[in-house]
Amino acid sequence: MHNRYIFATSALLVLAGTLRWSHALAEASAENVAELEEIVITAQKRTEKLQDVPVSAMVVSAQALANANVADLSDLNNLVPSVQLNGTINGRVPTGIRGISSVSNEQTVGISSGVAINIDGVPVPSDSFAANNVAGIQNIEVLLGPQSTLGGRTAASGLINLTTRGPSDTLQGFATTTLTRDDEHRFEIFLSGPLSDRVEGSLSAYKSTTRYPITNLATGDKTTQDVAGGRGKLLFKVTDDLDVTLMAHSELTQGHGFNFVYSYITPGHDLLFTAPPAFEPPFLTPAILLPGITPSSNNLDYASPVTSAGASHRDADFSLTIEDRLGGGYTLASTTAFQQEKQAQTQDLFAVDNFFWNSLTGNNVHIPGHPLAPFFNTQSQVSTVKQLSEELKLVSPTDLPFSWLAGAFYSDTNVDETYIRSLPPAGLDVHVVPDTKTYDLYARSTWKFAPATSLVTGLRFNHDAISYTYDERTNVVRFGVPGLPDIIEGPFFSSGSSSGNTVVGDVGLKQQFADNVMGYVTYSRGYSPAAYNTSAVLYSNAALDPVGKESIDSVEIGTKGTYFNRTLTFNADIFDTRYTDYQIQSYANAPGVITPPLDLSSVGKAETRGAELSTEWLATSTTRLNLSAAYIDAKFVDYMGAPCYGLQTAAQGCVTPANGSPSQDVSGDTMPNSPKFKATLGVEQRIPLGSHPYELVFGGTYSYRTSAQMLPDQNPFAIQSGFGLLNLSAALQSSDGKYSARFFVNNVTNRHYFTDVEDFWSGPWNGNALIGQPARDSVRYAGLKLTASF
C-alpha cells in the first residue's frame, strides 16, 4: 500500500518535471497565436485561478454545459468522472463524489449526502430540489474530496458550487431555445447591463418541458417534467469601495408520472402472495399487474392506473451580499440568505396496473373512523424546507507572503413534512419536523516561506445542534378481511435534541516547479455531523437516538500545470480517504415485509482511494481536445450487520440471529453506484468558411464507465454492466460566436442505462424485486439548439 503510493508520488513529480522542461523548450521554439482561457473558481471563499489551487477540482463552463446539452445537474455524471448523481424528477438528488454518498432515498429528511451543493457560495439545503436545474448557470465548480474546512458540515466527500450570471456595466444578453425529436423544449433569456451610474442589474428567465423515455402503458403517457423560473440581481455601487447585491430567485418544477420501472422480479413470485391461499387470486401475478412489461435492465415501461403520480417543487430564494473593500487589498463581505421550497409528491406505491387491495377485498374495505381506506395505490408527501444563513468573512490580498481569510457562518435549516401511506395493511400518517442549526468559525492561510514553496493550513470549529419532533398519528396493519385481525400501533409522539462540537482542518505543502507548474500534498480532517433517522417508524414515545458523527482522514497528492505557451493543461492527483463511523442508509428487506424500514446507521469503516486526471489541449487555434478520467476504489472496510437482499441464503452470507433481523457482512465489498473507472473524451473542431463571417463547429464527447454494484446490500441483480455514451453535434455559427444553430444527437449508440436501482419492493413480492430509474439520455435523441446574443 505505502510502496504503491510512494511510486505514484514519484511518478507524478517526475511527470511534472518532464513537462516543465517540455514547456521551456516549447516556449523557446514556437510562438502560438491561441491560448487556453484562464479559469477561475470561487468555491474556496475567494476568487482564485484553478491552476493555482492545491486541491483536485474541475470547472464546467457555460459553453461546455451548452455543448453537452446538459439538462440538469445529474448530467455531470458524463462530464466529471469522479461525480455520481442519481438524478430524480420527484425529490432530492442523491450525490456522490469518489464513491461516497450517505443518502439513498428522498424520504429521509434533514440528512446530508456528504456533498455540499452551493449556489453562488450559499449552501443549498440537502432536502431541496433547487440546485437540480442548471438554467441561468455561468459555470459549475466541483471540488473533489473532503472540503470540511471551508465547505462545512455537508462537504464530507466534496463540494459543488454553481455560479450564476450577474450584472454587468455594459448592455449584453442572449436568448436560446432547444427543440428535440422526443418533444423536449427549452427556452432561456438573459439580460444584463447598467440601470444608472451606480446601479447594474441582470434578469434571467427560463421555461422547459422534458419528456423522459419512460412510458405508462396503462395511459400511454410519458413521464414529464416542466420547469419555469427566473432570477434577478441588482448591484448597487454605493461607493467606489462598497457594493451591495440583491438576488431573488423563483422556480416551479412539476413532475408528472413515475420515474422507476421494474428491472427484475423473481420468476414465479406474485405480489402479496404470503396472504392466505383464499386471497391469492390471479390478478396478483406479474402477468396481470405488469401487462406488456418484461422486467429487465432494458425496460422503459411501467403500468399504473394512478394518474396523480408526480411531484412539484416551488422555490423562493433571496440573498443580500455586502462587499466592502477596506483598502490595501483587504475585503470584508457579508452574505445573508433565505431559501424556501414547498414540495408535494404523490407516488404509486408498487407501480402495478390494478388497485390490487380494493380488488382483493371486493372494494368492501371499511375501517370505522379511519380515512385511509379504500386504497388507491398511492402514498403522498408534503414538505416545506426553509433555511436562513449568514456568512461574514474577511479576506486578505493574495500577493502577500502570508495571505489568509477568516469567517463565521450560521445556518438554521428546518423541514416540516407530512407523509401519508394509505395502504390498509401498512397504513402510516406521520408529521415530522427536523431542525438543524450550525455555528461555525473558520480560517485558511497560505504562508510562502520560500520563493517557490508555500504552507497551506486551515481550521474550522463547528457547533451543530439538531432536534426533531415526530408525530406518528397512525401506524396500522389493517387487513379488512374476515379472519385477519387488525394490528394497531400508536399513535406515538417523540422528540429529541442533541448538540456537539467538532474541530476539523487541513495542512498542505505547495511547491511551484515553474511559473505554470506546481505540485502539492494535503492532509485533511473532515466530518459528517450526527443525525436523527426521522424515516424510522415509532413503536413507543421514546426519544430516538442520534446516529453518531462520521470522522474523515484524507491524503491527496497532485500536480497542476499549463504547458506549451498555454495550449495544454494537465492536472493529476492520487488520494486515499478513510471514513470512520461511516453513515449509510439502507432498506431492511425481509420476506413478507410490505414496507421495509429505511435504516440510517453508522457502520465501522469505509475507504476510497484512487487517481484522477484532467487535461485540455488547444492543438491548433481551431482544434480543442479534453480528457478527464478517474480510477476509484471505494469499499466498505468494516460493515457487519448490513441488510440482506431478497431471497439471500445463509450460503450466500445472510444470517438471522435469534432476536434480530436478517443481516450480512459486506466488509471488503464495493460502495454502491461507484464504477471503478470513468473517463470522458471531448473534441471540438472549428472550420472557418473562407471570407464569410461564419464557421462550422463539429463536436463530440464519449463517456465511459465500468460496471457498478448499485446497492449496498450487494444484490447480484443490481449490477449494471459497463457502457459508453457517444454525443455528437454540428453547428453553424457566426465567427464572433453571437449567433449559432447547433444540431446534436445524444446517446448515438442508443445505450440504455439506469441512474439508480432500488430493491425495497422485495418484501411485498416475497422475493427479489428491483426497480431502476432510466436516465433522460438512456435512449438516443436528436435536437436543434438556436442561440442569439449581443
Regions found by a protein language model. Give the residues of each.
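Structural signature of Gram-negative outer-membrane beta-barrels, strongest in the C-terminal barrel
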Residues: L235-T239, L394-P397, S403, F409-S411, ...
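Membrane-embedded beta-barrel scaffold of Gram-negative outer-membrane proteins
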Residues: S319-L349, Q512-A530, P546-L618, R624, ...
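C-terminal beta-signal and adjacent terminal beta-strands/loops
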Residues: R578, H692, S703-L711, L732-F790
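Outer-membrane beta-barrel translocator/receptor signature
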Residues: S112-G114, S126, A135-L144, S148-N216, ...
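N-terminal Sec signal peptide and the immediately downstream disordered periplasmic leader
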Residues: M1-A68, D75-L79, S192, D240, ...
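Gram-negative outer-membrane beta-barrel transporters
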Residues: L455, D576-R578, S601-M710, T787-S789
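Periplasmic-side early beta-strands and strand-to-turn transitions of outer-membrane beta-barrels
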Residues: N161, S168-T170, T178, F190-P291, ...
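Acidic, small-polar-rich N-terminal luminal/periplasmic segments of exported/outer-membrane proteins
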Residues: A34-T170, I557
